């Protein structure tokens, strides 16, 4: 069975549909929790605001403007977002930190048109090779990023964080096998959870230029480029990282080529204090909803709107993840188990109860 449709189907206690776990299913848990409360108890002891938008996958280009325009109506004591996951089956988790994101593209231009390599090879620059050389120099095979100043401000995990990730049933070999790899890569002096959550990264997301079709075409391309994402951690300044990246690229483009550097996205890493009253209420809610203590984890991905809520709106944000890591978001057979769906509803209802008491 393969389901890529927006229409859902149910099989063996699992709902399959595009958006089942990312993010319609998780959103629905909070709506149904409020509905169940009103049907069984009556008035909800909190003022709830539901903010639903459909542009998250393209960077939410209008969301910040909308929130600022309606700032007074949307101001809240706490924001609850469900766009993360549990650590694994029967392992509920509260995410207290997200990496930031700086996304860049650079485009190298040589001649004013594609050229024949037999006629012009040896006397004109090849943008493909310029881009390849710059990309190769950015990051070593050991996983170390070579851009000077890139690691400025990066701090190791605190002692309590080490204790938390050491609780996790983390198995490098199993994860590598699941991904079809002989082993995990990266900075081997750091354990995998640290590389995944506490260390910044640089990844080339795409490269283009020249001829990539079937067969041969002896072309020297006029232009070539690369798209690069950098996941940042607390202590790194996204604007500063973007400046360092641009300087690194420009210093390495030869005089016989031109370069354009484009900045697409800059958002800082976020850490939510685990002793915040809303986080403490969330721990109790997960304990009641899932029947076990939630793990405290970080997330290697980025949710830029969280940084906006925290830094601009001054609203603490709590990340409730009810899905599973293998729920296939954005892919065929995206899914959400009904068991986790129902536990998510219960957890959301318990949070309303516990947080309303804590907030007075």
Where would I find each of the regions flagged by the language model?
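Alpha-helix capping and helix-loop boundary segments enriched in small/acidic/polar residues
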Residues: 18-25, 57-58, 93-94, 119-122, ...
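A short core secondary-structure module
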Residues: 65, 121-142
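Active-site metal-coordination/substrate-binding segment of hydrolases
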Residues: 1-49, 343
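Short small-residue beta-strand/loop micro-motif enriched in glycine and branched aliphatics
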Residues: 15-17, 112-118, 213-214, 329-331
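Histidine/acidic-residue-rich, glycine-tolerant segments that coordinate divalent metal ions
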Residues: 45-126
């Amino acid at each position: 069975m393969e389901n890529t449709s927006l229409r859902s189907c149910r099989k063996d206690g699992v709902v399959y549909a595009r958006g089942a776990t990312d993010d319609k299913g998780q959103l629905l848990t909070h709506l149904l929790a409020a509905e169940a409360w009103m049907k069984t108890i009556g008035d909800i002891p909190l003022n709830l605001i539901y903010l639903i938008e459909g542009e998250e996958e393209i960077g939410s280009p209008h969301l910040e403007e909308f929130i600022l325009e309606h700032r007074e109506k949307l101001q809240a004591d706490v924001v609850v977002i469900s766009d993360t996951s549990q650590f694994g089956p029967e392992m509920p988790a509260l995410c207290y930190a997200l990496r930031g994101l700086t996304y860049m593209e650079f485009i190298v231009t040589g001649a004013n048109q594609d050229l024949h390599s037999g006629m012009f090879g040896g006397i004109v620059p090849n943008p493909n090779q310029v881009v390849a050389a710059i990309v190769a120099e950015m990051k070593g095979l050991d996983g170390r990023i070579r851009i000077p100043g890139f690691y400025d401000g990066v701090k190791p995990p605190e002692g309590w964080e080490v204790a938390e990730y050491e609780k996790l049933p983390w198995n490098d070999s199993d994860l590598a096998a699941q991904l079809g790899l002989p082993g995990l890569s990266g900075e081997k002096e750091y354990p995998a959870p640290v590389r995944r959550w506490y260390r910044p990264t640089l990844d080339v997301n795409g490269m283009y230029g020249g001829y990539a079709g079937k067969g041969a075409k002896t072309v020297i391309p006029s232009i070539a480029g690369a798209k690069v994402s950098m996941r940042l951690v607390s202590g790194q300044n996204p604007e500063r990282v973007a400046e360092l990246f641009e300087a690194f690229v420009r210093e390495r483009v030869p005089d016989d080529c031109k370069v354009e550097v484009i900045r697409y996205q800059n958002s800082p890493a976020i850490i939510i204090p685990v002793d915040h009253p809303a986080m403490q209420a969330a721990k109790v809610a997960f304990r009641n909803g899932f029947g076990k203590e939630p793990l405290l984890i970080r997330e290697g991905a980025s949710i830029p709107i969280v940084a906006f809520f925290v830094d601009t709106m001054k609203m603490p944000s709590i990340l409730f993840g009810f899905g599973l890591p293998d729920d296939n978001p954005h892919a065929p057979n995206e899914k959400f188990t009904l068991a986790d769906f129902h536990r998510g509803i219960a957890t959301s209802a318990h949070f309303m109860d516990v947080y309303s008491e804590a907030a007075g």
